[in-house]
């Protein structure tokens, strides 16, 4: 019995070392949109992320103040809390929604099934589209397609709502991302975004230990840059397409428990080891340092979880919106 325990401990330590080596030697640095697509294709195809995180590849909402909650349930709760915060719950059935960075469609299906919305989900990953389509019953009014959030294929003023969860860190051009999100909204339409952000380094520059931590958080999951909450709100306002003010809030405390819960899933669900084998175990352990760094960064104030809400102004988009040129002719004229 003792020998078996020692063998199991040695095997776990060996796989942990291998996972750490892979983490250090083979980061997933952002190179282009293709590198993001390839990363999500790989994560989708091996099934490990879906097994542990469910249909929602985003953090959970644990309440205010946060309380203990089932990890998968917290993700469902996040969607409903975001609907309420964005003031979408009273919109009529048939409201058209664009889910930007839809993953494998978890949020899209809730929005369609439980709120009666007509949802289009887009992702840069072909394999995520395939899996989202497999998971979506025919009676659920949600469809999915490959698209680029920096150059959306939809005409101006196409949707009543644009919704996005944790897609922004993958965008190298935050100003263009902001413009595209608002461009495809109808006048009076609502934009609701949830994202990982960093502290506004214009106010408090990153210190000597924060810079390497931030570099690891960017390089391990194909992130070119994190915006600050203040900075992305300014990018949205600078498009000239927002009616009134951009509303923001900070959900760091509400989402913080999700990082350690992500690791805990591997402990409380050991059947994953049987299902995915030694290779799956090594892949899972490879992600643990990033989860721990994320918990450290969000807990210490280096990173923040930002929420954004904006209403689309009744103006036309021009090619020079980013430079401040707006056609004030009403869209419907």
Question: Can you name each region flagged by the protein language model?
Answer:
Residues 150-162:
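A short acidic, Gly/Pro-enriched loop at the edge of an enzyme's catalytic core
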Residues 205-207, 212-302:
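Substrate-binding/catalytic lobe of Class I Rossmann-like enzymes that use SAM or dcSAM, i.e.
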């Amino acid at each position: 019995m003792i020998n078996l325990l020692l063998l199991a401990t040695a095997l776990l330590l060996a796989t942990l070392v291998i996972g750490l080596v892979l983490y250090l030697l083979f980061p997933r640095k952002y190179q282009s949109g293709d590198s993001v697509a390839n990363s999500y294709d790989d994560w989708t195809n091996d099934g490990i992320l879906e097994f542990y995180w469910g249909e929602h590849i985003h953090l959970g909402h644990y309440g205010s103040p946060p309380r203990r909650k089932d990890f998968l349930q917290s993700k469902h709760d996040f969607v409903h809390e975001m609907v309420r915060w964005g003031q979408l719950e009273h919109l009529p059935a048939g409201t058209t929604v664009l889910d930007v960075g839809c993953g494998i469609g978890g949020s899209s299906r809730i929005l369609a099934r439980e709120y009666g919305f007509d949802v289009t989900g887009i992702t840069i990953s072909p394999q995520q589209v395939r899996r989202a389509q497999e998971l979506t019953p025919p009676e659920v009014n949600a469809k999915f397609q490959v698209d680029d959030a920096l150059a959306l294929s939809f005409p101006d003023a196409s949707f009543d709502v644009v919704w996005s969860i944790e897609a922004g860190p993958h965008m190298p051009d935050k100003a263009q991302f902001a413009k595209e999100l608002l461009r495809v909204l109808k006048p009076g339409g609502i934009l609701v975004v949830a994202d990982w952000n960093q502290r506004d380094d214009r106010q408090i520059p990153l210190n000597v230990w924060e810079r390497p931590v931030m570099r690891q958080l960017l390089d391990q999951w194909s992130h070119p840059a994190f915006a600050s909450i203040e900075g992305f709100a300014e990018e949205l306002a600078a498009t000239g397409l927002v009616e009134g003010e951009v509303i923001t809030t900070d959900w760091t405390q509400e989402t913080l428990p999700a990082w350690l819960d992500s690791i805990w899933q591997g402990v409380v669900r050991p059947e994953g080891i049987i299902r995915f084998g030694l290779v799956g175990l090594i892949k899972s352990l490879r992600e643990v340092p990033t989860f721990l760094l994320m918990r450290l960064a969000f807990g210490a104030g280096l990173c923040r979880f930002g929420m954004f809400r904006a209403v689309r102004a009744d103006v036309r988009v021009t090619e020079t919106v980013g430079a401040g040129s707006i056609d004030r002719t009403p869209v419907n004229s």
